[in-house]
């Protein structure tokens, strides 16, 4: 039982560390300019920077499908 608890604690620590590294990698300062773009996921983003940031944080490949709202 103690071994399982120790493994669980280690696993939680590793996941937390990986998430922290992802946050640092994906940190972007996006302006509040509203220049909507339609993402390849069918969602409208306020601007290209927001789309890029969302793609990085979600670890998905989202590209600009076209300018303007979807």
From Swiss-Prot:
Signal peptide: 1-20
Site (Reactive bond): 32-33
Protein's cellular compartments: Secreted
Entry-linked InterPro entries: Kazal_dom, Kazal_dom_sf, Prot_inh_Kazal-m, Prot_Inhib_GrowthFact_Antg
Gene3D superfamilies documented for this protein: 3.30.60.30
Keyword set, alphabetical order: Disulfide bond, Ion channel impairing toxin, Neurotoxin, Protease inhibitor, Secreted, Serine protease inhibitor, Signal, Toxin
GO molecular function: ion channel regulator activity; serine-type endopeptidase inhibitor activity; toxin activity
Domain (Kazal-like) ranges: 21-70
Cytoplasm is among the record's keywords: no
Reported tissue expression: Expressed by the venom duct.
Any single biological process term in GO: cell differentiation
Family annotation (SMART domains): KAZAL
Main location (coarse class): secreted
GO cellular component, one term: extracellular region
Function field: Acts as a neurotoxin by inhibiting an ion channel. May also act as a serine protease inhibitor, since it possess the kazal serine protease inhibitor signature.
Protein name: Turripeptide Gsg9.2
